[in-house]
UniProtKB/Swiss-Prot annotation:
One of its GO terms (molecular function) is serine-type peptidase activity. It is found in: Secreted. Its main location: secreted. It comes from Arthroderma benhamiae (strain ATCC MYA-4681 / CBS 112371). Residues 1-20 form the signal peptide. The lineage of its organism: Eukaryota, Fungi, Dikarya, Ascomycota, Pezizomycotina. It holds the Pfam family Peptidase_S9. GO terms for biological process: proteolysis. Keywords: Glycoprotein, Secreted, Signal. This is Uncharacterized secreted protein ARB_06907. Glycans are attached at residues 137, 146, 164, 210, 257, 628, 717, 799. GO terms for cellular component: extracellular region.
Length: 930
């Protein structure tokens, strides 16, 4: 009998932790049960299998241990065409576009009715601020086929360099290398009764036969293709091409290589074998039980994947809607933990609504990578959003580190740059020069090669849980060496990881012992300017600026004063120019906590040994010797909360609420001497905070004096004591009774707070015509964040804001007047029979229904959850609002936005309203409501 029958497969759910044994499919059930009992797989009184079947997998994350840029599966179940796209494409451009502006619309061809209404005419011209004589014309571009790729790739090369680029760049910098255009070609489908899986690297928006699709695959993840049921023949493809410097860089000519793949698939449930994510086997032990794989539903019906045996569980099935892709998570665990086979084979069983018979997918084989203990290893773990992620790591194995087995060592974090995966060899080996370091070396994935959202809300949650997963590693790997201090981090990162280092130490400073940002940029708007954005009202423009300030680390330097910082940057870096590091070095000097700064002559952005230079080796070896550092908090320090921002503790102080999200909140702290025990706090724009004394890296205060009011600190109940300032400026202390649905707090705070979900997202679309948008929303969340998403076509309940189930954040897609199931309650934004209404301190502003009117806004649910409402008076307004679901950094969405028929042309410059909700879910005073 094959060795894999010695294995059991466990169901893994975000909602319950119970594990249930399961064997591979073998027809002779009784023989299997007898064998299992004899070999110890089933213990006396254990489960008897009336049917040995595939396992159900509760939806988790698809984040693979291989480079996600090659996840289109070229297996035998996929019907391939050599080159289904046209050789020649009609191109119209270039036109101006700002940094990450295309999410808002901002398409100049909307002034002519949209590209889809235009026919190729080499004599026609269109006004453009980037083209010669101010006129853009039609041109032709050709494709070539990369037949060595599997599946074959069709590559469309576009180079529409703006006229007089050198002079333009001298004025506007890298923003001058950004432009947009449209391209038209064809796609030929050869087979009937098939589904086309369309992959569109570098494309954010396109049309197929004049039907619009938004999201695409801008970074080339190839995780969630658009699944199309197209008839045989030729189909028109219109691509909106955007050259984004943040994604494509600014070195060399500003060309765009669009990569297209079209696969004709059979109508079934397809296992994407290249998406398999599993932990490594180290010294013959599987170091984590968590695993996942992506399924694509190319059938015309929903698919239920379910267990076929008696099992007590809270959620015993997972559903894929028509044309949906989802990652399916599960656990693998051996009874004989030191006898791991080289591979295991398994499959899924599923049913459809119109056929109760059980069907099965093709078999997939999981082949384990085997490592030795001193090597960098791949570990897997669950995220709160119900997905499986991974990190690579190296335990401290040297004899020097393990002299005292009772010792506990800090975590050394290495954050990768944009477009790289933690499993890439370049990342796995970047700290090999200090492989004997006495720390737990960890390379988080950030969920995706772009670290989710640049190591911010989504990516940082992955970082946090990759650290916590080290405790599980100790359990599963059989580790017997030194322990772990999972609250002491030494962090280093390169490029985007350097920016992630700035983010981490400015937002979660109490976790950091020391930091080394290497060739890191300071913020996205300092990396690529926003000077090409459409002009707009100054109050409206300030709204977008505030929405980006949570990630503008230049204004948050005071948050990490006192933490040792080593900076290194190549003097000849043409990717992230050295100005970024010089600027932060100067700002740290001004804060009174200067960094150590090392500029490497003649070196560019990346070079061999960059992360293990003598300068950085000194950094690592110095600060791994300072675990449990208790002297990092200066006598005087500050807490700076950015406008509409969110952060962890600084000096143990956690700001729960500001008075207004329209400006910075701050607390200046002067610590008294240890025998004095008094901390004096001076606050600005702080409404409520509490102390987490366990996070304080100094003596815990006996008293705190807040703007002159004195309170006794009792460490045992500090986390349940809140200090609150009323409207008159008086400070009081109290319990947690204030935490109700009328208050904004916890996971609801900050921009992109919607991404802080504790379970899979649920997207609800009751109206038939809105279902494609529900699928688009889930596809984009999966494509860009690897997030899991449940689609529901049920009518939202009238009391959805107070419902406690499901546990995650919601998206509700609504169309027309008083949408079925929607209730405004006491919300600041409501939808009546004739208008969209916004309540402010000045009264109620109503926007009567008109073509193109739409809105997107968050509203509170119980238990710190959020609901993202996407609404339109018609489909045009709804589709425009749906573009602003937060999946791409730098777009600058505030808490609410009201779009109109002018938004596709003028983007954010045309909005009726945009702004933020304060701590009581009221529209803030500086919000723009026209």
């Amino acid at each position: 009998m094959p060795s894999f029958v010695l294995w059991t497969f466990h169901l893994c759910s975000q909602w319950f932790q119970g594990l249930t044994d399961l064997l591979p499919h073998i027809p002779d059930t009784q023989t299997v049960n007898n064998f299992a009992s004899q070999t110890g797989l089933l213990y006396p009184g254990g489960m008897k299998y009336s049917k040995i079947a595939s396992w159900v997998c509760i939806p988790l994350l698809t984040c693979r241990g291989v480079d996600a840029t090659n996840s289109a599966d070229g297996g035998s179940e996929l019907q391939l065409n050599e080159s289904p796209f046209s050789k020649n494409w009609q191109v119209l451009g270039p036109f101006e576009i700002g940094t990450r502006e295309s999410s808002w619309g901002a398409d100049p061809l909307e002034a002519y009715g949209g590209f889809q209404t235009l026919q190729y005419d080499p004599k026609a011209s269109f006004d453009s601020s980037l083209a010669l004589n101010g006129l853009a014309n039609w041109s032709m571009a050709s494709t070539h086929v990369n037949s060595t790729a599997n599946p074959p790739e069709t590559i469309l090369d576009i180079n529409l360099s703006p006229d007089n680029l050198t002079s333009l760049q001298e004025v506007y910098g890298w923003d001058a290398k950004q432009y947009q255009a449209w391209a038209r070609g064809t796609l030929t489908v050869s087979k009937s009764n098939s589904v086309v899986a369309l992959y569109t690297d570098r494309i954010w928006e396109y049309r197929i036969d004049n039907k619009s699709y938004f999201g695409g695959d801008f970074f080339g993840f190839r995780r969630a293709p658009l699944l199309l049921d197209l008839s045989p023949g030729t189909h028109t493809v219109d691509l909106r091409v955007v050259r984004d410097v943040r994604a494509l860089g600014a070195v060399g000519e500003p060309f765009i290589n669009v990569t297209l793949i079209a696969q004709e698939l059979s109508k079934t449930l397809i296992v994407d074998k290249k998406s398999i994510l599993v932990a490594d086997v180290v010294e013959n032990r599987l170091i984590s039980p968590h695993a996942s794989v992506t399924l694509h539903n190319t059938m015309g019906n929903p698919v239920d994947v379910a267990a076929r045996f008696s099992l007590k569980m809270l959620n015993n099935n997972v559903k894929l809607e028509e044309a949906q892709s989802r990652a399916i998570g599960f656990t693998i665990e051996a009874k004989d933990k030191i006898n791991v086979p080289s591979s295991v084979s398994l499959y899924f069983e599923y049913t459809t609504p119109d056929d109760s018979s059980v069907q099965r997918t093709q078999t997939m084989t999981i082949t384990f990578t085997r490592r030795k203990l001193p090597e960098v290893q791949q570990n897997t773990f669950m995220l709160p959003g119900g997905v499986v992620s991974y990190a690579t790591m190296r335990p401290p194995t040297s004899l020097e580190c393990n002299k005292d087995k009772s010792a506990k060592l800090p975590v050394l974090l290495g954050l990768h740059g944009a477009g790289q995966a933690a499993s890439d060899e370049i990342i796995r080996t970047m700290l090999d020069g200090v492989s004997d370091i006495c720390a737990w070396t960890l390379f988080p994935s950030g969920v995706t090669p772009w670290s989710g959202d640049d190591w911010h809300t989504w990516g940082f949650a992955d970082l946090q849980h990759s650290v916590r997963a080290l405790n599980d590693y100790i359990k599963y790997s059989g580790w017997t060496g030194v322990g772990l201090i999972d609250g002491d981090w030494i962090i280093a990162g390169h490029s985007n990881g350097g920016q992630g280092t700035w983010y981490t130490i400015s937002h979660y400073p109490d976790k950091i012992i020391a930091a080394a940002p290497v060739a890191g940029y300071t913020s996205i708007e300092n990396y690529v300017p926003y000077s090409m954005w459409h002009n707009t009202d100054s109050l409206l423009a300030s709204t977008f600026y505030r929405a980006r300030q949570d990630f503008k680390h230049e204004i948050l330097v005071d948050n990490f004063a006192g933490i040792p910082v080593y900076q290194q940057h190549g003097a000849s870096d043409d990717n992230v120019v050295v100005y970024h590091s010089r600027l932060m070095h100067r700002l740290l000097q001004e804060s009174g906590s200067p960094s150590k700064y090392h500029e490497v002559p003649g070196k560019n952005h990346w070079y061999t040994g960059i992360m293990t230079s003598d300068f950085l080796k000194d950094f690592y070896r110095t600060y791994v010797q300072r675990p449990n550092a208790t002297d990092l908090l200066p006598q005087r320090f500050s807490v700076t909360l950015p406008p509409a921002g969110h952060m962890g503790t600084r000096g143990g102080i956690y700001v729960d609420q500001s008075h207004t999200p329209d400006r910075v909140g701050s607390i200046e702290v002067e610590r008294g001497m240890a025998n004095d025990g008094v901390w004096k706090l001076k606050t600005r724009n702080i409404r409520r905070f509490h102390l987490e004394t366990s996070a304080i890296r100094s003596h815990v205060p006996l008293y705190i004096q807040i703007d002159g009011s004195r309170f006794t600190v009792t460490p045992s109940n500090s986390t349940t004591t809140w200090y609150t300032q009323d409207a008159a400026g008086k400070w009081t202390s109290g319990g947690d009774s204030w935490r109700t649905i009328s208050q904004r707090y916890g996971r609801q705070a900050g921009v992109n707070a919607f991404l802080r979900t504790e379970a899979p997202f649920t997207v609800t679309a009751a109206a038939q015509e809105t279902r494609d948008l529900a699928l688009q929303t889930c596809r984009n969340l999966f494509q860009y964040l690897s997030a899991d998403c449940i689609i529901s076509y049920a009518v939202p309940t009238a009391n959805s804001t107070t419902a406690t189930s499901p546990a995650g954040n919601n998206v509700v897609i609504l169309l027309g007047a008083q949408p079925n199931g929607y209730t405004a309650g006491d919300s600041a934004i409501s939808i009546s029979a004739r208008s969209l209404d916004i309540k402010t301190s000045q009264g109620t502003t109503s926007y009567p229904f008109e073509p193109g009117l739409g809105a997107i806004f968050i509203r509170p649910l119980v238990n710190e959850r959020l609901e993202l409402v996407i609404w339109g008076s018609d489909m045009a307004g709804l589709q425009q609002a749906a573009r602003l679901v937060p999946v791409l950094t730098g777009v600058g969405q505030p808490d609410f936005v009201v779009v109109n028929k002018g938004t596709p042309l003028k983007g954010q410059g045309s909005l009726y309203a945009a702004g933020f909700f304060d701590s009581e879910w009221k529209v803030s005073a500086a919000s723009y409501v026209s």
